[in-house]
C-alpha cells in the first residue's frame, strides 16, 4: 500500500484526459494517495488525480474518474 500523500505512477500522466464526473478536460498532472475521510477514527486514503485545465486552474477528482481523450 502506498504511503500517505505519496505521488503515484499513472499511465496517463502528462496526457490529455477528461474527468467523467464533471466533464472537465485537461492534462493529468499528478495522482496522489490522500486522506479522504475517517471511518471509526481510522483515516481512509484514496488516489486523487489533479487535472490542469487550459485556463491553468487545477481540478482534483478520484483517479478512477480519469479517462483518456482521443
Residue ranges and their predicted role:
Residues 2-70:
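Basic/aromatic-rich interaction segments and small domains that mediate binding to polyanionic partners
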Amino acid at each position: 500500500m502506498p504511503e500517505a500523500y505519496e505521488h503515484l505512477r499513472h499511465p496517463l500522466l502528462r496526457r490529455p484526459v477528461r474527468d467523467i464526473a464533471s466533464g472537465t478536460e485537461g492534462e493529468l498532472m499528478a495522482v496522489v494517495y490522500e486522506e479522504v475521510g475517517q471511518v471509526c477514527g481510522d483515516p481512509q486514503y484514496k488516489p486523487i488525480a489533479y487535472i490542469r485545465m487550459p485556463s491553468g486552474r487545477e481540478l482534483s477528482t478520484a483517479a478512477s474518474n480519469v479517462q483518456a481523450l482521443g
